[in-house]
């Protein structure tokens, strides 16, 4: 049985709280940079990367939650053959969760 090695690219960036578009671009740039260096199978981002951390009361705004989800959807298209693990908030009913999304298109 042949074992396949999995490479993980860990992204250490400093997303700005509330800057969804800027943080999305920061994520895309990090993926591009890591792809050129080592082409990892998995790109691993930090907690609440999409919104920046800590989002505090911004997390209660529906427009921020909607923008976060849209950013995650866009991120799915960036590197469809790889896995992207990234933190973002998700609303389910009246609850808001601190999620780690595992993305692959």
Feature-to-residue mapping (PLM):
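Hydrophobic structural segments
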Residues: 1-105
